[in-house]
Regions:
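Class II aminoacyl-tRNA synthetase catalytic cores and aaRS-like
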Residues: 1-334
Length: 334
């Protein structure tokens, strides 16, 4: 039976406890990752969004009733533990940020029991996607997905702070609007008040941000939800989020400068250094050098113009293209 957490206050998250806290009393709450009963001692790995902490239950520091409860713990039980931070008496676990310490429990409350989950709550799960989506609330407990959402949150905070420092105002624009010409089909929402009429969900805040420029708000941004009634593909999402901005009284170099510095700070969150200025090329230069308007410059596979070399070769495909004003280009694979 689930117990109440009344009277308990979590003091910190699992990975926030360090060697400097040895000897201190802490209260942790989270999910049981796994439990190992060694007879007179029970080891439990307690997990929350910050990481994992090893909890030790022994008769003496914890009551007999508490020890019996600990013996029944299973994966994904939600528990609250009070105890003392200790240096690990056994081998240090170098795979954990908390691998040098553990909590010797003196109190345990089972806040919620759990049935056996349909798949292991662990990183790099091999579970089929349809099963993971069916139990999405369990899938989102996995550390790799939690890291993604935590990083996304950090990026959003960074973007807001950076653009605020640059003089931008965060202004929300309407979601329910009339249909306007865009690059895809609109999602339509029927109106209850006006039967037979429909709202359109925005494919972008384009018109609204242009109106804001007319209204004197010379630097606007929002982290905007956008909707496009398209099939789901690798580069197409029916619902997506974008960093949307608009500036007045600037030229193209001003826009590029703001975005370059923002990208540099965003990539720094994942320890990737982006030297500035970012190399630039015109569309024509990209097509001439790489044959693409979105070239992958990592490999240096540039096109070489061999028109003069092959113009008299007698090969109809080449000579025909040259006679019509075209050129012959190829990649040097040597």
């Amino acid at each position: 039976m689930a117990e109440s957490m009344k009277g308990l206050k979590r003091t910190c998250r699992c990975a926030e406890v360090t060697k400097a806290d040895i000897g201190k009393k802490v209260t942790l709450m989270g999910w049981v990752q796994k439990s190992r009963n060694k007879g007179g001692i029970i080891f439990v790995d307690l997990r929350d969004r910050s990481g994992i902490m090893q909890i030790i239950f022994e008769n003496g520091p914890i009551s007999e009733e508490g020890f019996e409860k600990a013996a029944k713990l299973r994966s994904e039980f939600v528990i609250a533990v009070e105890g003392e931070v200790m240096a690990r008496s056994g081998a240090v676990n170098e795979n954990l940020a908390t691998g040098e310490i553990e909590i010797r429990a003196n109190s345990l409350r089972v806040l919620s029991e759990s049935e056996t989950p349909p798949f292991p709550i662990e990183e790099n799960s091999k579970t089929r996607e349809e099963v993971r989506l069916k139990y999405r609330y369990l899938d989102l407990r996995r550390p790799d997905l939690q890291k993604n959402l935590i990083l996304r949150s950090k990026v959003a905070v960074l973007v807001r702070q950076f653009l605020a420092d640059e003089g931008f105002l965060e202004i929300e624009t309407p979601i329910l609007n009339k249909s306007t010409p865009e690059g895809a089909r609109d999602y339509l929402v029927p109106s209850r008040i006006h039967p037979g009429s429909f709202y359109a969900l925005p494919q972008s805040p384009q018109i609204f941000k242009q109106l804001l420029m007319c209204s004197g708000y010379d630097r606007y941004f929002q982290i905007a939800k956008c909707f496009r009634d398209e099939d789901l593909r690798a580069d197409r999402q029916p619902e997506f989020t974008q960093i949307d901005m608009e500036l007045s009284f600037v030229d193209v170099d001003d826009v590029l400068d703001v975005n370059e510095r923002l990208l540099q700070k965003m990539f720094a969150l994942i320890d990737v250094d982006v030297p500035l200025p970012i190399p630039r090329m015109t569309w024509q230069e990209a097509m001439d050098r790489f044959g693409s308007d979105k070239p992958d410059t990592r490999f240096g596979m540039e096109l070489n113009d061999v028109t003069e070399v092959v113009k008299n070769c007698g090969f109809g495909v080449f000579t025909g293209a040259i006679e019509n004003g075209g050129s012959v280009r190829g990649i040097n694979a040597v």
